[in-house]
Amino acid sequence: MSTKFLIAILLLLLSSPLAHSQNQFVTTHGKQFLTPDGKPLILRGMNLGNWLVPEGYMFKFKTANSPRLIETVINQLVGEDEARGFWKTYRDNYITREDIHLLKKLGFNSVRIPFNYRLFISADDPTKLEGDGYQLLDRVVKWCKQEGLYVILDMHAAPGGQTGDNIDDSFGYPFLFESNDSQELTVKIWQKIATTFQNEPTVLGYDLLNEPIATHFDANYFNPKLEPVYRKIVSGIRMVDKNHIVFLGGAQWDGNFKVFGPPFDDKLAYTFHKYWFTVNQEAIQEYLDFRDKYNVPVWMGESGENTDEWMSSYRTLLEKHDLGWCFWPYKKVDATSCVASVNRPADWDEVVNFANNPRSTFEEVRKARPAKEKINNALGAFLENIKLANCRLNRGYLNALGVGQAIE
């Protein structure tokens, strides 16, 4: 076979649609993320928390703190039929094209989108991969593509529960690691999501499991189970998608990287979360050491819920070490530690009191339920107030993250 012929074949392969497609994606190179044109990419992102995984504290609820418990509150207030309408409007209003446009204008270059697996299966038959989640992700990814924001998709609540707390919408135990059925469903959902976005470069990567294995549980028992589950999910994704980066979070709230061996895929990145600590070099040294040891990208995928001064100090430390970041959260009720604060509606305290009162018996539910007029007023106003046009921006929060200079 002649040299000219081999060169011709090589040029043909390099010019093929597949090669062209792969060159459109952010990839990894050593410790860095690289843009399609080969430039280093430092992620400056925002978590769209409370949209597809509601959390009680962002509603000002205390005991109703997981999606299931919050859904129960709304069901008990208005019934299942009206509740379905409430959640549809909630998801349509909470994150819109205007929100994505704002984030880009503020100076962010990426968003992390936490999602609940229940939005990706049939409520009647969990083996059917049908649900509103696919359309919701497709819509927001298209907005991000139009605005020029990268997207990291985050399975915040996995089948069976990967954390064993309110944030994973579980029943208080990380059953995922003991259930083959839950693991298989997790793989299938990720496969379908990966199939959907396999050729979409706006999606930067997949954050497989948010904050697996809470500190409440026996780490010696659970931690050895984590990487095998990750390997199973990655293997499933790679059957349909070899383009995207896969993010692995450590055990114990994404903080413990000792569970990891050497990287087992050529497009792996590792993500840590860190809240409520004294900001200094020592606090992040283990993640820097891990990055150096394995020559892989490391990304700070969540932090926040603190003072503006603390946020600024932490963000500066991360940037000093070329660590990309994604702070938490974008929007919540009546708060300063977010980009956009939702104004508390009139009569909202009636809803909050109902959510916080004992409701373990039908009698307690009846006694706690506010008047129908107050319920309707509060929920209706809430659905209007979550629209960006009705929110207020927190200038101190934006300044702390070094963004927002384009907004007067």
Each model region followed by its residue ranges:
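Boundary at the C-terminal end of the N-terminal hydrophobic targeting segment
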Residues: 19-21
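Extracellular glycoside hydrolase catalytic/binding regions
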Residues: 25-26, 184-332, 337-355
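Conserved Rossmann-like nucleotide-binding pocket used by diverse enzymes
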Residues: 14, 151-152, 299
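Sec-dependent N-terminal signal peptides
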Residues: 5-15
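N-terminal secretory signal peptides that target proteins for export/translocation
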Residues: 1-2
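Aromatic-rich peripheral "rim/lid" segments of glycoside hydrolase catalytic domains that contact
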Residues: 310-408
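Active-site mouth of glycoside hydrolases
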Residues: 28-43, 48-245, 250-258
